Amino acid sequence: MVEDYFSEQVKKYYKDRHVIYGRCAHLTESKPIFVEQGRGMCMSRRICQRGCPLGGYFNSNSTLIPWALKTGNMTLKPNSVVHSVLYDETEQKAVGVRVIDSETKSSQDFFAKVVFVTAATLNTNLILLNSTSKRFPNGLGNDNGLLGKYIAFHNYRATINAEYEGFPQFTTEGAKPTSHYIPRFRNVYKQETDFLRGYAAGFGARPARDTNREGIGEELKSNLLKTKETGLWSVNSHMMGETIPKKSNKVTLDTEKKDKWGIPQLSIDVDYDDNDEKMIQDFFEQFSEMYTKAGFKNIRINDNKRRPGNDIHEMGGVRMGNDSQTSLLNKWNQLHECKNVFVTDGAYL
């Protein structure tokens, strides 16, 4: 209700901004293809972060791996920690992957004609950096020394909260898999700010109830149920800012520290910059204005100042480009210098 109201107000006052329902890859209805994959519908349990045994939302564990197993062409090897990609000096190509058994700590080599590295951004960088040979002493395909550099991520530091007095007769019912969403509207068609790129944002609303939380057991239950009326609506947004892939934002292998499987740990050296700080201030200014025009009160902004890495969406480190002097992958996600190795996760930014 409040989300739809906010969407209408933004549409009324702005031509370049839209409040839409967030997009998420979960199943709201069953179809034969999903049944064949072994997936069930989303049951609105709201514990998605635990993983979905029903396959209600798309992910590798409940969707891709079971589907691949059904082909008969895949062997699943649990307890396998990838150590490196194997490179043959004579054939001048990758010939397989070395893994460490997480329980016995013994190593085993698997051989293949083509290798896909898709271990999530930072681990993909780690694996390639650890894939050394006489031909590639600094990491597989790393002739130009750029492997591990130009890391980017999303900036979630900024939030804004407020209250709304409208719709006192309504409350929420049921569950939904995501919140409303405001796609990026800054610097989309032209450069209009003193910072590069832009940000998207979430938007959510819930009725606040002034409840008595004293006591335990039956006393607590009774106190919680005494208040029937809902209070003001609490509304909030969080920024999802683009960071610029910079050479100074990088990951390297630690020369001294190793994990319990003998693999070098990853040293991460990334930070915010002036562009990120300007973006945060713009978010505060723009959303304070949007909230005010929507009639929201008691507007509060917050910069949590948390370090990079506490959020999600790490990207980069294995750059894509046409020039092998300035990138590691071509437009087909192949390493320029070892074309039977493909990188197909967020590392190929």
Enumerate the predicted regions with their spans.
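Flexible loop/turn segments at secondary-structure boundaries
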Residues: 27-33, 83-86, 106, 123-126, ...
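A short, glycine/Asx- and small/polar-enriched loop/turn
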Residues: 35-36, 88-95, 311-316
